Swiss-Prot record:
Alphabetic keyword roster: Secreted, Signal
Protein name: Thaumatin-like protein
Pfam family, one: Thaumatin
Induction: By pathogen infection.
GO biological process: defense response
Gene source species: Oryza sativa subsp. japonica (Rice)
Amino acid sequence: MASPATSSAVLVVVLVATLAAGGANAATFTITNRCSFTVWPAATPVGGGVQLSPGQTWTINVPAGTSSGRVWGRTGCSFDGSGRGSCATGDCAGALSCTLSGQKPLTLAEFTIGGSQDFYDLSVIDGYNVAMSFSCSSGVTVTCRDSRCPDAYLFPEDNTKTHACSGNSNYQVVFCP
């Protein structure tokens, strides 16, 4: 039989592990710019947006409880020190850190996470602005290099473009793969 001290220590370890799991991330998104030009990726509802020079990577830790979101690249952007400005494509109300979806045209990575299975896709329904690939750690890579992209949603009822992967997967978005 365990001593009271041992039982208390085990209980503390279990409580700490439970609390740590409650604050865990639902997924990690690694976004890389392989283009020869700067891309300003945006992510909603988490992440916001940043400037990525060629070769740079941005990592987003999506918190548990997030059920879906979008990632896209913006091009031709100019922002001031307060994060206000504009982009030629994918602009989100003139903000560097997006809280709204981007404006057409934009190549869009979409995800639904949580539970035992996640879903993800690329879409060019709202236009095409930059080549992109999107993959999860346990699924296939979907790639879009032009506006006639066979791996992406081309119209809303195009229900053959969604891909599944096991829950708790991590994701990679690459611009100009």
